[in-house]
Regions:
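Inter-domain helical "communication" segments and dimerization helices
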Residues: 1-131
Length: 131
């Protein structure tokens, strides 16, 4: 009897890591290995490997650490400046590697958080941003 193999993810490793990091920066979202596994269409082992590689990359380039909480959720820790620089860097990568993720997941979450906080709509309204 042949073991059942999961089909490979349609996303490359850099795309998966980009989506992992941008998910960690989404406001109000608790991200676990299961979250990343479902998001990227991979099993938990590959998701764990991607999380580890993402953590190594942000440590090397941005002096940030990726820590796991007691409930299995992950978060990015470091100075506010390093976190912002990291976010901008990965947003640029995201626009190149996985633009559909940014438009369908990241942007709506960010807009709803800005609305919830009472930020003036003209800062995030699509009509004004197109001008």
């Amino acid at each position: 009897m042949m073991p059942t193999l999961a089909p490979p993810s349609v996303l490359s490793a850099p795309q998966r890591r980009c989506q992992i990091l941008l998910t960690l920066f989404q406001p109000g979202l608790t991200a676990t290995t299961a979250t990343f596994s479902e998001l990227n269409g991979v099993d938990d082992d590959i998701a764990s490997l991607d999380i580890s590689e993402t953590g190594q990359e942000i440590l090397r380039y941005h002096q940030l650490t990726l820590t796991a909480g007691y409930d299995g959720s992950y978060r990015v820790e470091g100075t506010v400046l390093n976190q912002r620089l990291c976010l901008f860097h990965w947003l640029r990568r995201g626009f190149r590697l996985c633009p559909s993720f940014i438009t369908s997941h990241f942007t709506p979450a960010l807009k709803s958080e800005l609305k919830r906080r009472g930020i003036a709509r003209n800062f995030y309204d699509d009509t004004n941003l197109q001008a």
